[in-house]
Amino acid sequence: MNGFSIIIPAHNEASVIESTLRSIIASKLDRALQIIVVANGCSDDTAARARAVAGPILVIETPIGSKPHALNVGDRVARYFPRAYVDADIQLSDNALQKVVDAFKDPNCRIAAPTPRHDYTGHNPLLGGYYRLWRSLPYVRGAIMGSGFYAIDAELRSRFTEFPALTADDKFVRNLTRPEERRVVEGCHAVINMPETFGDLLRVKTRWTYGNLELASARPDLNVNDQDRYRGVPTHLLMRPWLWPHVPAFVFIYLYTRNAARKKIAQQQNTTWERDDSSRTISRETRPAA
């Protein structure tokens, strides 16, 4: 039987997990749906809240607070391909599941994700300006990563045995593919609430950068080179003078987080589950996907 498995690693996500699950279940799909929530290292009632949502949901609890471990636990019981790995704090448009599944009708597609929609409604003007500049960049608009949702087929899953103990699981999987095997699916979206304070933004961006540096060090064979994506940024910005006022904030955040991430690498500090909590303080029910 055709189906679609979704694995959600969730660490202390009680404030958002119900809304995320309802968003997934409300998204139309022409096949069986299997949702696996792996509540890992939780000290709240994430698991109980996930079980309270009606639908084809299996909740697994593990005392180990690790996203890679949670992904591997979910993988062991997942039944279907395509198979998606989804953050616990996103909202999907009601056609996202079907659109992503349909992308795999192309025999060359190995990984697909809905178009990310970054929500920074109500943020202070300085942060809002930074986000407008950042999301205008070509490497952000066309990235598989960044939507909190990526789906893969069985052939791509066969290219690795299990998720390694690395922060950037999405980039690890993406870099096992060639560019022509990747699809950012238009006509559907996943909403990501952006950090609401500079402190949270710096922490999240440091974690992202740390994950990229960690992956480049651990898997040099994957040819991870984040510097390449910045080469066209000066020209991009030069042609968009309305973004110039936000360049100082962009440069500061880039330099600060890269330096902080390098220090963490040098000190071998683990940043697993360091995240933005500012966007989780208000129920996601108040932030519809469409």
Model-derived features with residue positions:
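Conserved donor NDP-sugar-binding/catalytic core segment of glycosyltransferases
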Residues: D94-P125
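Acidic helix N-cap motif at the loop->helix transition within catalytic regions
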Residues: S15-S19, S43-A52, N95
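Terminal low-complexity segments of carbohydrate-biosynthetic enzymes
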Residues: M194-P195, R203-A290
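Catalytic donor/gating beta->alpha subdomain of glycosyltransferases that bind UDP-sugars
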Residues: F104, H118-T121, L126-L127, A165-D226
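Short aromatic/hydrophobic "clamp" motif used to bind/position activated sugar donors
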Residues: R83
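A conserved acidic beta->alpha catalytic loop
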Residues: S23, A39-A47, I64
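Short, well-formed alpha-helical segments that are part of the catalytic scaffolds
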Residues: N12-A26
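Glycine-rich, basic loop-to-helix element that forms the pyrophosphate-binding segment
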Residues: E61-A78
